[in-house]
């Protein structure tokens, strides 16, 4: 179980 996807952080 990798868990929920992480939010995309802008560069």
UniProtKB/Swiss-Prot annotation:
Keywords: Hypotensive agent, Metalloenzyme inhibitor, Metalloprotease inhibitor, Protease inhibitor, Pyrrolidone carboxylic acid, Secreted, Toxin
Task performed by this protein: This peptide both inhibits the activity of the angiotensin-converting enzyme (ACE) and enhances the action of bradykinin by inhibiting the peptidases that inactivate it. It acts as an indirect hypotensive agent.
Domain of life the protein comes from: Eukaryota
Tissues where the protein occurs: Expressed by the venom gland.
Protein name: Bradykinin-potentiating peptide S4,1,2
Intracellular or extracellular location(s): Secreted
GO MF term list: peptidase inhibitor activity; toxin activity
Gene Ontology terms describing biological process: regulation of blood pressure
Residues modified as Pyrrolidone carboxylic acid: 1
Entry GO terms, CC: extracellular region
Family membership: Belongs to the bradykinin-potentiating peptide family.
